[in-house]
Amino acid sequence: MTLTTKHFDVEIPSIGFGTWQLKGDTATEAVKTALETGYRHIDTAQAYENEKAVGDGIQAAGSAREDFFLTTKVWTDQFKDGDLQSSTKESLKRLGVNEVDLLLLHWPNDDVPMEETIGALNDARKQGMTKNIGVSNFTKDQFDKAVELSDAPILVNQVEYHPFIDQTKLLAEAGHKGSALTAYCPLAQGRVFKNETIKMIAERYGVTPAQIVLRWFVQQPGVVAIPRSSNPEHIRQNFAIDEIHLDGDEMARISALRMHHDRIVDPDFAPVWDNPLAA
């Protein structure tokens, strides 16, 4: 069964397959395994330099195009009007598809006016390159501005989100605007496996810490998670969470870990992040 969250009449599979840092044959085999396992949401990006490999994995799995949700992201050096559309066409060629389901701006870029970039993103949608549009790594204020500037709904804000980071503000704002929040690094690059709270809950259910955390995500309204793995067994385990049902206390105990506010992805070009403690 594919768990989904619905936004602006669009059904987004709640567990997707992330492909960051997967390259070449490894990416191809991982995507093939994911689709054969039952994943119906694949996430890639121009900057990952694996769109061709991801497309090969899609083809190898033999999945009908209408049966899965495909996301890619435009890199910041392609944010000018014209550049964005041209680069998206190249992405489609590499992926071997006529359109993606979701096209995201990968990071905010203050060097190009947001009005221009959001306009170009909407134009790519009007030209049939993507069904939906969204953003990634946008702060609350940047997200609000993107929503205000866009003709089409901003379906998603994709951000770092795991049990050890406080994204309460972005979650609330996405919900207020009707958008989804997609979590990358949902397993905190393996840190969830070492946490005693998560390990204890996993032992109670007889499942992995990863499965517990992914279930924690899908039980939050409007949240999507995109775990990544090149290990076939882990790919299959991460998808097998239908039979897990966390109670309110377990959800709260995992959510309380956000007090650590431990951010993993913070490059030099990142925006000034929202302060979870500020009013």
Feature map (PLM): residue ranges:
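Short, acidic/polar
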Residues: 23-35, 80-95, 116, 143-144, ...
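Alpha-helical scaffolding within the catalytic cores
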Residues: 1-5, 52-59, 87-90, 140-143, ...
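N-terminal binding-site loop/beta-alpha segment at the start of enzyme catalytic domains
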Residues: 1-68, 277-279
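Beta/alpha (TIM)-barrel catalytic core signal, keyed to glycine-rich beta->alpha loops juxtaposed to Asp/Glu
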Residues: 108-279
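A short, structured active-site edge motif that brings together acidic residues
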Residues: 65-79, 99-108, 137, 161
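Residues at the N-termini of beta-strands
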Residues: 41, 99-102, 132, 156
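Acidic-and-aromatic substrate-binding clefts and catalytic sites of carbohydrate-active enzymes
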Residues: 23-25, 45-53, 77-82, 110-113, ...
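CE4/NodB-like, metal-dependent polysaccharide N-deacetylase domain
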Residues: 84-104, 123-127, 149
